[in-house]
Amino acid sequence: MSRLEIYSPEGLRLDGRRWNELRRFESSINTHPHAADGSSYMEQGNNKIITLVKGPKEPRLKSQMDTSKALLNVSVNITKFSKFERSKSSHKNERRVLEIQTSLVRMFEKNVMLNIYPRTVIDIEIHVLEQDGGIMGSLINGITLALIDAGISMFDYISGISVGLYDTTPLLDTNSLEENAMSTVTLGVVGKSEKLSLLLVEDKIPLDRLENVLAIGIAGAHRVRDLMDEELRKHAQKRVSNASAR
């Protein structure tokens, strides 16, 4: 297969995956116990992300206090060595980060039970160490893991995934080379349902193809959810074993 051949006649992608295969997915929680109430580190393909959750805690300013629910903040820090697509205009990059933060806040405000934490603030800090496509989905997954580690109540997992459309073939969990060559969508899927908490369309996709793209994305997100659940269960078992050994 040619080095720049996105999808070969044999059905292989640039990294050797089939159209419906996920990238390598590794995650761990409670990675920064002294720096945050909840934390996670995850690698999805070449995406490497640290997520810290601080709170619920009392806000510094009374103006930030809501007597009926918690205030949720998200900050995204893109490291200079993360392969972030940088334009000559720093304003464009800043606007892109602001859009990501706004989308994440809106999504998790609907999934976190903020009403049971009135008069508090929950700060989510994300540090992107390296990225290689599908970054929004990876951010979603990192936040979900860190919130659960912090013991913050949510209605369900939210799992993120990207899907590209190459000609008429959907490609699951796209990397950056694939994203640059085709239209992509990012999904945030609630639990094992087909309910979407996020649908981000990066480019035009024919309506007659969209239903298939979404179905494949939802199925892929369910697999990501299972991988996150597996990590959480392993961590819980480890904690129980350590407690029993004392």
Curated annotation (Swiss-Prot):
InterPro entries recorded: ExoRNase_PH_dom1, ExoRNase_PH_dom2, ExoRNase_PH_dom2_sf, PNPase/RNase_PH_dom_sf, Ribosomal_Su5_D2-typ_SF, RNase_PH
Record's subcellular location: Cytoplasm; Nucleus, Nucleolus
Main location: cytoplasm
Biological process annotations from GO: exonucleolytic trimming to generate mature 3'-end of 5.8S rRNA from tricistronic rRNA transcript (SSU-rRNA, 5.8S rRNA, LSU-rRNA); nuclear mRNA surveillance; nuclear polyadenylation-dependent CUT catabolic process; nuclear-transcribed mRNA catabolic process; nuclear-transcribed mRNA catabolic process, 3'-5' exonucleolytic nonsense-mediated decay; poly(A)-dependent snoRNA 3'-end processing; RNA catabolic process; RNA processing
Pfam family, one: RNase_PH_C
Superkingdom of the organism of origin: Eukaryota
Recorded GO MF terms: RNA binding
Keywords: Cytoplasm, Exosome, Nucleus, RNA-binding, rRNA processing
Gene Ontology cellular component terms for the protein in this record: cytoplasmic exosome (RNase complex); exosome (RNase complex); nuclear exosome (RNase complex); nucleolus; nucleus
PANTHER family: EXOSOME COMPLEX COMPONENT, EXOSOME COMPLEX COMPONENT RRP41
Subunit structure: Component of the RNA exosome complex. Specifically part of the catalytically inactive RNA exosome core complex (Exo-9) which may associate with the catalytic subunits RRP6 and DIS3 in cytoplasmic- and nuclear-specific RNA exosome complex forms. Exo-9 is formed by a hexameric base ring of RNase PH domain-containing subunits and a cap ring consisting of CSL4, RRP4 and RRP40.
Miscellaneous notes: Present with 5150 molecules/cell in log phase SD medium.
Function comment: Non-catalytic component of the RNA exosome complex which has 3'->5' exoribonuclease activity and participates in a multitude of cellular RNA processing and degradation events. In the nucleus, the RNA exosome complex is involved in proper maturation of stable RNA species such as rRNA, snRNA and snoRNA, in the elimination of RNA processing by-products and non-coding 'pervasive' transcripts, such as antisense RNA species and cryptic unstable transcripts (CUTs), and of mRNAs with processing defects, thereby limiting or excluding their export to the cytoplasm.
Family from the record: Belongs to the RNase PH family.
Stated name of the protein: Exosome complex component SKI6
Biological source species: Saccharomyces cerevisiae (strain ATCC 204508 / S288c) (Baker's yeast)
Gene: SKI6
